[in-house]
């Protein structure tokens, strides 16, 4: 409105300060008008076509007066000298503006320049001039902005905005009130025409948001830029009036009550000099070229180049940099720039030195302020040509380069699209690939169609449907509206910088579109539970182009496909939206990933190319696999990776086949593989072909018995592998491991058949020894008994996390079933052996004794083993998948991280245990110990449940566990820890702790052996590749333990004691132990559990989280500090679990809490707690001993 002109720069002597003031004022203006919340109020003077309060000549006269530096001497019947009500309104608006600014400040925290500007604005707006000088005349405001066109706008605009409430405007009719006074008076300080919150300005229809800096001819060019045409009303007005005035929408007083420019409509903002006089034509598409670009007079042109020009070319001036403009002020501010941006029809020759676009230098503002494309929220203020032209305005050469992501010729370089400064080519590449740049480019490209040029880098859209405020946070998020809010964010450079945040805020919808278009990642949901493989997922994308990466998240039935090109991804999504993809009869939900633009995490194992090759060679492989599959030699790789990576084409026949097969998937695969039908065909057919179990598994995974379910799941495999296992227990570790487990389940049901094997095994001393060894190793992994209990718990635990992961649970169940079966077989074998000949068992015991603690463990573990096997297998099964998941952790919006985390850790555990099992006892690493601990913990928990029945059994299990744990503790730390625990427990009861002592001795011995065998860890690692023997051994040991269980727990502790004696203590100790067991087997068990439970129970509790072997990975990769509550501030920061001091909280809670030591201690602690809970539930007295054990254990840990 004329007011803006009135605000002439001359009026404000502090022209040089204008820029800051602009920034300040603009927010103020925006804020007040909108916040008033009085959008209802503000409309009070519905922006009638700004009827010149005075005739145009009068307006011009007013402008002249303003130029004469007569700030308040505007001839207009200036409502600035307002009634008390107007003043109040202005005050309210000012307050609202402050709030808005504060909010804006929070949004611009990432933009230093923007933050600075906001701070300045806040300081000034905060009543730097009481109440914006509330009645400060536009001229005053104008003066302030005089020097810098843009700044000027900011200063005077605010007033206009506030007045919009009637203050600035002459009575209601003054809406845009051509009157120079417009609303400037009310918001002197905030008077930033640039409405930081376009929403604000738009709300007040009558606000003459932008007029402020028009006042001065020379300097104001930018001023005009500040019209609040962004106001909703204004925008609309523009829509009608601004057809021709893309640049000066604000001027369009008619729609813009604020008319923003004091001139009514666009016409006649002749301000002084007519420079502000962006006559209607000026703005109109016809806007006359004479009105130098942006409708400023020629001299304005010069100034515009400097100031407004800066706006136009965001690059030179801060405009370019401050994407914020378009973001925050975009709506209103944008309007200002919009003013500059001439309508399409008229390429105002506002020559921008940097943007020598002859057709639209001014459009630089409107269309996108070139560099500061945000600056000029060129959003087409209106759908009309003007807007269209603005938005369509071709990018400058340098802008096109930036738009296309071409490397800049000179560095540092400021991205003209995002206003982001880049210092080297690497940064440039990152920026070009980044979300901000992609979104801004998208906005820009959309703006041409929408008539809204992407004004800000973030997400502001140039044009807001309601009004100028493309960005309006409040309400005009509709970029698409034609409203002529082709606000160029130019108006306030300062804001431009600060606005970047806002743009994103306001451009919710736009952003979504941007995101959609910007990324190459397709998010696939609702995958069929057990039957979908990597090949299936990749096949979905192959028809549309090259698939460069993928992530299959089986736990959450989701997948991410990264296509080579965005267009390919978009085409894929569009196609599948029209024709949903179906896998195994289930429709998939396929959409663009709103979270990822590309998948940076690579999956371990085969790469996408390999998978694709697999897909192409699927049939051949299937043909070959049928033979291999059924062959006993077919080893199943235990590594989770191969499976997850190459599910169907999946690994090469034997070895590469991953353990994934243990789950339904494997069955599905088998069936699919058996039939050379393409995968997708296999989809539903697959199901039909699949064992009936596939359906059962899928539909009733939890309802089925473990054995039953596992049997069903692994039916084919189980039997095949069973034969394989019996045939080749050692060679194919992974195969034997899984097969053994499967066999175990199968054997369990056909116990007679299974018994045969068990009997045979026990009958052979060599075998029994092997089994014992395996058991020892496996117990270290998971103590059989403990495992058994853990198994029960695990199913619950894993199922809880798995919840939807029925397949994982099934896998684990299958594995457990296999192990259980093995365990059952072993138990049967052991029992048979016992029944057939106690001597044989004794031999086993002797072998165990020879093994040292290992023997004890195996015995105990036998009983535990059946359970443990299940638990072990379950964790393994679950863990397998999770391992990949962890690496895959590129979680989309779905919140899969939780699921991923749990699966990953268990999977990790599984992996480690396999390796560990392969290792000899001495070779077993701390990882093994940890895994054993976890398994034991689970076992303990389960045992705890069963302990109520057999104290002796517990004692047996516990001692076995303890020794196994000691055996599995290769590190001195582990050894010491167990020793400490044992000692602590011995103290409470020496007699009862005989077992503990024995255990500790065994522990130490085994640990030492392990330590000694650290050298042999490398071989152990090699062995890791063949986990099957370990599994077999573990299973064997578990049967042995089962025997012990059968004998010791039911019969008496003496029996148990004898194994223990044989293991690691003199007969006297064993006697003591046996006595202790008899007297208080639970107590002894508790003690042993306490000693070992800290490690195991913790492990158990944390097993789902991570196994020791994974601890380093978990901490480094997942960066999950655990047990932070144990770090307490002392002189420094002290960890109560580990007894370590740290000077900084970060070191203690972040670094230390992710350390292996802390993690182990936490596991032990949690295991103790778990034991206590179990025993308390059982009603045993063990809690007290456990507590005693825990205390000393922790204390020693502290020590």
UniProtKB/Swiss-Prot annotation:
Q: What is the effect of changing residue 639 to G?
A: Knockin mice show severe cardiac phenotypes, characterized by dilated cardiomyopathy, leading to premature death. Decreased localization to the nucleus associated with an increased localization to cytoplasmic ribonucleoprotein granules
Query: Which stretches are tagged as biased composition: Pro residues?
Result: 43-52
Domain of life per record: Eukaryota
One GO cellular component from the entry?
Answer: cytoplasmic ribonucleoprotein granule
The UniProt PTM text for this protein says: Phosphorylation regulates the subcellular localization. Phosphorylation of Ser-637 and Ser-639 in the RS (arginine/serine-rich) region promotes nuclear localization of the protein. In contrast, phosphorylation of the C-terminal disordered region promotes localization to cytoplasmic ribonucleoprotein granules.
Q: What ranges does the record give for the region RS, renumbered to this chain?
A: 630-649
Induction statement: During early embryonic cardiogenesis.
Q: What happens without the gene?
A: Mice were born in normal Mendelian ratios, are viable, and do not exhibit any visible phenotype. They however develop cardiomyopathy and display splicing defects in genes related to calcium handling such as CAMK2D or RYR2.
UniProt-annotated location(s): Nucleus; Cytoplasm, Cytoplasmic ribonucleoprotein granule
Q: How does it assemble?
A: Associates with components of the U1 and U2 U1 small nuclear ribonucleoprotein complexes.
This chain's protein is named RNA-binding protein 20
* Provenance organism: Mus musculus
Gene encoding the protein? Rbm20
């Amino acid at each position: 409105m004329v007011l803006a002109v009135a605000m002439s720069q001359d009026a404000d002597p502090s022209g040089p300060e204008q820029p800051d003031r602009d920034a300040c004022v603009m927010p103020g203006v925006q804020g007040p008008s909108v916040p008033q919340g009085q959008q209802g109020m503000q409309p009070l003077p519905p922006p009638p076509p700004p009827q010149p309060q005075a005739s145009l000549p009068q307006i011009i006269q007013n402008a002249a007066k303003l130029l004469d530096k007569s700030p308040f001497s505007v001839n207009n019947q200036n409502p600035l000298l307002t009634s008390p009500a107007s003043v109040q309104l202005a005050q309210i608006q000012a307050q609202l503006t402050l709030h808005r600014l504060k909010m804006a400040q929070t949004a611009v925290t990432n933009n230093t320049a923007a933050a600075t500007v906001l701070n300045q604005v806040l300081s000034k707006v905060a009543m730097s001039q009481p109440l914006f000088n509330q009645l400060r005349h536009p001229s005053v405001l104008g003066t302030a902005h005089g020097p810098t066109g843009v700044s000027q706008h900011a200063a005077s605009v605010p007033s206009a905005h506030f007045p919009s409430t009637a203050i600035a405007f002459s009575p209601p009719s003054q809406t845009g009130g051509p009157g120079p006074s417009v609303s400037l008076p009310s918001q002197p300080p905030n008077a930033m025409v640039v409405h930081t919150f376009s929403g604000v300005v738009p709300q007040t229809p009558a606000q003459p948001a932008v007029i402020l800096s028009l006042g001065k001819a020379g300097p104001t060019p930018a001023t005009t830029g500040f019209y609040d045409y962004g106001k909703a009303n204004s925008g609309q007005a523009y829509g009608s009036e601004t057809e021709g005035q893309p640049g000066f929408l604000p001027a369009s007083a008619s729609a813009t009550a604020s008319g923003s420019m004091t001139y009514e409509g666009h016409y006649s903002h002749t301000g002084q000099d007519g420079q502000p006089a962006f006559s209607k034509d000026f703005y109109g598409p016809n806007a006359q070229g004479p009105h130098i670009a942006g409708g400023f007079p020629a001299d304005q042109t010069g100034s515009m180049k400097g100031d407004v020009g800066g706006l136009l070319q965001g690059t030179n001036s801060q405009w370019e940099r401050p994407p914020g403009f378009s973001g925050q002020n975009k709506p209103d501010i944008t309007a200002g720039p919009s003013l500059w941006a001439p309508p399409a029809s008229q390429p105002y020759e506002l020559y921008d030195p940097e943007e020598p676009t002859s057709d639209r230098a001014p459009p630089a503002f409107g269309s996108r302020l070139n560099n500061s494309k945000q600056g000029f929220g060129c959003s087409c203020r209106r759908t009309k040509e003007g807007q269209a032209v603005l938005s369509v305005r071709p990018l400058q050469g340098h802008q096109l380069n930036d738009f296309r992501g071409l490397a800049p010729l000179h560095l540092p370089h400021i991205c003209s699209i995002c206003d982001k400064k880049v210092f080297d080519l690497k940064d440039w590449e990152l920026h070009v690939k980044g979300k901000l740049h992609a979104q801004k480019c998208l906005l820009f490209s959309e703006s041409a169609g929408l008539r809204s040029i992407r004004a800000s880098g973030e997400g502001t859209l140039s044009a807001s449907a309601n009004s100028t405020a493309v960005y309006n946070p409040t309400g005009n998020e509709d970029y698409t509206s034609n409203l002529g809010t082709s606000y160029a964010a130019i108006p306030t450079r300062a804001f431009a910088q600060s606005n970047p945040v806002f743009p994103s805020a306001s451009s919710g919808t736009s952003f979504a579109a941007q995101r959609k278009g910007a990324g190459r990642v397709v998010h696939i949901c609702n995958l069929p539970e057990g039957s979908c493989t990597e090949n299936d997922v990749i096949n979905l994308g192959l028809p549309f182009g090259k698939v460069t990466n993928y992530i299959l998240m089986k736990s959450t039935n989701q997948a991410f496909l990264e296509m080579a090109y965005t267009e390919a991804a978009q085409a894929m999504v569009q196609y599948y939206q029209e024709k949903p993809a179906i896998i195994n009869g289930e429709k998939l939900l396929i959409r663009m990933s709103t979270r990822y633009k590309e998948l940076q995490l690579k999956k371990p194992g085969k790469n996408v190319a390999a998978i694709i090759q697999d897909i192409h060679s699927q049939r051949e492989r299937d043909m070959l696999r049928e033979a291999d599959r059924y062959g006993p030699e077919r080893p199943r790789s235990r590594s989770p990776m191969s499976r997850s990576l190459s599910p169907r084409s999946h690994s090469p026949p034997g070895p590469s086949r991953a353990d994934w097969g243990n789950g339904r998937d494997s069955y599905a695969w088998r069936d699919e593989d058996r039939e050379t039908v393409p995968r997708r065909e296999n989809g539903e057919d697959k199901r039909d072909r699949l064992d009936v179990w596939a359906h059962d598994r899928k539909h009733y995974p939890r309802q089925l018995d473990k054995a039953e379910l596992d049997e069903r799941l692994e039916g084919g495999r189980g039997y095949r592998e069973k034969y394989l296992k019996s045939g080749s227990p050692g060679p194919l570790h992974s195969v034997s491991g899984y097969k053994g487990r499967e066999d175990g389940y199968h054997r369990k049901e056909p116990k007679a058949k299974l018994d045969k094997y068990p009997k045979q095994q026990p009958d052979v001393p060599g075998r029994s020894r092997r089994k014992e060894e395996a058991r020892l190793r496996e117990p270290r992994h998971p103590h059989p008994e403990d495992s058994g209990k853990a198994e029960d718990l695990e199913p619950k635990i894993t199922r809880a996390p798995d919840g939807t992961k029925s397949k994982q649970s099934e896998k684990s169940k299958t594995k457990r079933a296999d192990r259980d079966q093995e365990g059952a077989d072993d138990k049967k074998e052991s029992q048979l052996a016992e029944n057939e000949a106690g001597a044989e068992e004794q031999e086993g015991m002797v072998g165990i004794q020879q093994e040292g603690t290992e023997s004890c463990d195996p015995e105990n573990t036998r009983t535990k083993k059946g359970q443990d096997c299940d638990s072990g297998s379950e964790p393994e099964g679950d863990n397998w998948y999770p391992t990949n998941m962890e690496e895959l952790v590129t979680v989309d919006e779905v919140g899969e991280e939780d699921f991923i985390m749990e699966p990953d850790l268990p999977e990790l555990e599984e992996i480690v245990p396999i390796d560990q099992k392969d290792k000899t006892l001495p070779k077993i690493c701390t990882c093994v110990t940890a895994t054993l601990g976890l398994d034991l913990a689970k076992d303990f928990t389960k045992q705890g449940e069963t302990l109520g029945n057999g104290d002796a059994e517990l004692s047996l299990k516990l001692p076995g566990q303890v020794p196994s744990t000691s055996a599995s503790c290769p590190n001195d730390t582990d050894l010491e820890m167990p020793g400490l625990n044992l000692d602590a427990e011995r103290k409470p009861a020496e007699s009862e702790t005989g077992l503990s002592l024995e255990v500790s001795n065994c522990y130490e011995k085994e640990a030492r052996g392990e330590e000694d065998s650290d050298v042999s860890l490398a071989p152990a690692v090699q062995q890791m590749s063949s986990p099957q023997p370990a599994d077999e051994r573990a299973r064997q040991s578990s049967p042995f333990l089962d025997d012990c269980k059968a004998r010791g727990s039911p019969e008496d502790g003496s029996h148990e004691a004898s194994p223990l004696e044989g293991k690691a203590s003199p007969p006297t100790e064993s006697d003591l132990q046996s006595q202790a067991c008899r007297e208080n087997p639970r107590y002894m068990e508790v003690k042993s559990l306490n000693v070992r439970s800290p490690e195991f129970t913790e492990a158990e509790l944390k097993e789902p989280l991570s196994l020791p072997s994974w601890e380093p990975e978990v901490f480094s990769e997942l960066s999950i500090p655990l047990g932070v509550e144990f770090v307490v501030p002392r002189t420094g920061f002290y960890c109560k679990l580990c007894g370590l001091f740290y000077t900084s909280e970060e070191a203690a809670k972040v670094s230390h809490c992710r350390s292996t030591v802390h993690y182990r201690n936490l596991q032990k602690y949690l295991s103790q707690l778990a034991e206590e809970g179990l025993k308390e539930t059982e009603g045993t007295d063990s809690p007290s001993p456990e507590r005693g054990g825990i205390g000393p254990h922790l204390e020693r840990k502290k020590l």
